[in-house]
């Protein structure tokens, strides 16, 4: 675990999240809340490269770096877990899977071509090249996401 990952892990532990080893080839942990069971982040290494992915759909105005990471992830997966906005009055409500049918668990975003889409909130979004300089911003994002989880 890198020093940046350790700093985020310490913060998540202070909020009541615990690491749960993932059953994957690489060393990966999901950070799951002890009370609610909700996963807020995944950290570890993929192919020996440090990996940090977070959920931030509950953050009212996420930083540009996080919005860019979301759009990059949608494009990299060729739209997997994303679809058109089905309920214009309830944008974070896709209805495609059980994770989102309760509403409020998705990322609303606009592609560069102006298309409005919703990406499923069941999966954390990888943040590329995560370093020590990113820790304060990540803590702010995770604090806001945790507060949002508390309202559900």
Predicted stretch roles:
Residues 24-149:
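Short, conserved beta-strand/beta-arch hydrophobic-aromatic motifs that form part
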Residues 1-21, 134-147:
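Amphipathic alpha-helical segments
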């Amino acid at each position: 675990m890198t020093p940046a990952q350790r700093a985020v892990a310490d913060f998540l532990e202070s909020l009541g999240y615990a690491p749960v080893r993932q059953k994957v080839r690489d060393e990966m942990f999901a950070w799951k809340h002890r009370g609610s069971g909700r996963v807020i982040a995944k950290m570890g290494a993929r192919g020996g490269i440090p990996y940090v992915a977070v959920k931030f759909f509950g953050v009212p105005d996420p930083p540009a770096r996080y919005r860019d990471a979301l759009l990059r992830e949608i494009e990299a997966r060729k739209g997997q877990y994303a679809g058109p906005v089905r309920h214009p009055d309830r944008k974070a409500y896709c209805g495609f899977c059980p994770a989102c049918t309760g509403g409020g668990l998705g990322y609303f975003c606009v592609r560069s071509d102006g298309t409005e889409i919703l990406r499923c909130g069941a999966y954390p979004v990888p943040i590329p090249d995560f370093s020590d300089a990113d820790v304060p911003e990540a803590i702010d994002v995770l604090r806001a996401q945790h507060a949002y989880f508390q309202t559900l």
